[in-house]
Amino acid sequence: MQGAVAGLVFLAVLVIFAIIVVAKSVALIPQAEAAVIERLGRYSRTVSGQLTLLVPFIDRVRARVDLRERVVSFPPQPVITEDNLTLNIDTVVYFQVTVPQAAVYEISNYIVGVEQLTTTTLRNVVGGMTLEQTLTSRDQINAQLRGVLDEATGRWGLRVARVELRSIDPPPSIQASMEKQMKADREKRAMILTAEGTREAAIKQAEGQKQAQILAAEGAKQAAILAAEADRQSRMLRAQGERAAAYLQAQGQAKAIEKTFAAIKAGRPTPEMLAYQYLQTLPEMARGDANKVWVVPSDFNAALQGFTRLLGKPGEDGVFRFEPSPVEDQPKHAADGDDAEVAGWFSTDTDPSIARAVATAEAIARKPVEGSLGTPPRLTQ
């Protein structure tokens, strides 16, 4: 009985030992993680992202290192500037382990090392700058920190990707002064912008008034030109009308005289008839205010005979009678050239010179004034 119990205990110990051996001989390393393996206390190899077999009780995993980029934020550090002002600056460092073996064997804690190195480098960089330079040179400080840290941590198997200054806090008294200065600057800029706006508004208003006066002067000028041209053409047309009327009146009188003489010649009056007509006309002539006394000459009949001889010739009975004038004695009409000129007096067509003058005035009126605010209105005829 005791032997059976002892056998069971021994068997259980063997099973447990086998389980321990199997557990010690297998290591599963996930992706983006590296395992540093030692054999008998010395570095053996580095594995990542695989199932690794280990020699039990001989090989062991010294450390597991995360290969992803890490973001480490350090607490604010007091830093003294060149003008002896203390600033509290906190930084953020982005780094990645590239050589796991160096990160394990070259430094005991690379995170603490990065923090201390960042603080030291930050003090060296900011110590050579004034407060104003520190506040306005973040990119320059970040670049210097990254260059120094990347070079210093290279032997630790690290790669510094980026360094950022998260905040720069000056002392409370300096903050109050800065706030006052910022307020004064804002008020100054506001006053400058207000003055600039007022000046621009005044300039625009003056420019508008100037252009309005220019346009008004141009309009008055063109109106005066058109009025003068219209008056000139009106006078010309009136003169042409009066000339045409005088011509028509003279032509009518000439036609009347021509018809009268033609009628007289066609009637062939005798001296007795002319004497009778003269005597019939004497009472009407005597009614005038300037005609008081009329004397009939004794040789009146002889005078009529002489007048008749000029216009007629004696007939068979010895009496002078009027004869129609020959064709060549008839009044001749004016030449075609004169008729064409006279016909032009009665033409109602628009004078081309008037049309050209109006077109020129409209073109000048529509021409935009240099620097004007708009296009002048079109003048209509």
Swiss-Prot record:
Q: Name one GO cellular component term.
A: extracellular region
Q: Where in the cell is it found?
A: Membrane
Q: Which superkingdom heads the taxonomic lineage of this protein's source?
A: Bacteria
Transmembrane ranges, per UniProt, are: 3-23
Note whether Metal-binding occurs among the keywords. no
InterPro entries according to UniProt: Band7/mec-2_domain (IPR050710), Band_7 (IPR001107), Band_7/SPFH_dom_sf (IPR036013), Band_7/stomatin-like_CS (IPR018080), Stomatin_HflK_fam (IPR001972)
Q: Which SUPFAM superfamilies match?
A: Band 7/SPFH domain
The keyword GTP-binding is assigned to this record = no
Q: Name one Pfam family in it.
A: Band_7
Q: What is the protein's membrane topology class?
A: Single-pass membrane protein
Matches recorded under SMART domains: PHB (SM00244)
Keywords assigned: Membrane, Transmembrane, Transmembrane helix
**Family, per the entry?**
Belongs to the band 7/mec-2 family.
- According to UniProt, the name of this protein is Uncharacterized protein Rv1488
Which organism is this entry from? Mycobacterium tuberculosis (strain ATCC 25618 / H37Rv)
